[in-house]
Amino acid sequence: MASRGVASYRTEVWSDWCPGCGDFGILAAMQKAFAELNLDPAQTVVVSGIGCSSKTPHFINVNGVHTIHGRGIAFATGIKLANPQLKVIVNGGDGDLLGIGVAHFVALGRRNLDVTVLIHNNKVYGLTKGQASPTLRRGEKVKSLPVPNLQDAVNPIALAIASGYTFVARAYSLWVDHLKEILKAAINHKGSAVIDVLQPCVTYNDIYTAEFYKDRLYKLEDDPSWDPIVRDPSEDEEKKAAAIKKAEEWGTRIPVGVFYVNPLKDTYEERLAQRNPSYSIDNPPALQPISREDGSPIVGPDEFRKIFKRFIVNVKKL
């Protein structure tokens, strides 16, 4: 496969993100990561829900699916199961993925389906004028709120680990190269992967600004004693506990980097193939013919009756 440069993953679609938006850094990291991994655009799918972050598929020259609010992971699940050979990456905001879409977020972790999720975490609903998202802490009042937030915050790292994700990381949108390296590792990981990407919202969030993060963030990999990788099943509980404890750090010091990796767990598509002989990762449903050469369906009326014979009820007139 010929090597592709970063420019080949860019589109000519104009971005209407606010100047200074953290989404620009995430987009740049994705394009650079795709180029360094030399991903085939025809075999790569970027999926999103609704929100500022969910415009991302329009700006990357791969297959893009811009779906409905909170359902990006649900669509990505269908895409991956239909063709496990694809690289599938989900982009969504903290409101999109951890609010209305949180059930799908948890389900993806439980399944350990080989999909990568990027959470654009700016702690507000930017597209709808700055309401508090699930990651804004109780008592905090960003400039778009008339009163302080009444609800406690979701910790994306802790939730991901509890849900079963086997690659869990946090990054910062303005540290583009650091995010790029984490994203490459997440895409190469076999299993469900999530990156909680902290980012400023210059329009509505006057608390979590670039200035706020500048002197607080530190990289986990700078600590030589930090080892998030599970190399034996007996280590799993200890690694998870350490990751959750580290994820609770917030305030004067905020860790970014890889919190937890378990490469030992089989994926959902592998388990599905073992249980269902008709499901094949090498010959997935998306690549199987749905009609004969003459255009007629492979499963005609006679075959249909044979397959579903035990479900057919013959009703006799009295």
UniProtKB/Swiss-Prot annotation:
The keyword Zinc does not apply. Optimum temperature is 105 degrees Celsius. Its EC number is 1.2.7.11. Thiamine diphosphate binds at residues 50-53, 69, 95-96, 126-127. Keywords: Iron, Iron-sulfur, Magnesium, Metal-binding, Oxidoreductase, Thiamine pyrophosphate. GO terms for molecular function: 2-oxobutyrate synthase activity; 4 iron, 4 sulfur cluster binding; magnesium ion binding; pyruvate synthase activity; thiamine pyrophosphate binding. Mg(2+) binds at residues 94, 122, 124. It catalyses: a 2-oxocarboxylate + 2 oxidized [2Fe-2S]-[ferredoxin] + CoA = an acyl-CoA + 2 reduced [2Fe-2S]-[ferredoxin] + CO2 + H(+). Catalyzes the coenzyme A-dependent oxidative decarboxylation of different 2-oxoacids such as pyruvate, 2-oxobutyrate and glyoxylate to form their CoA derivatives. Heterodimer composed of an alpha and a beta subunit. This is 2-oxoacid:ferredoxin oxidoreductase 1, subunit beta. It comes from Aeropyrum pernix (strain ATCC 700893 / DSM 11879 / JCM 9820 / NBRC 100138 / K1).
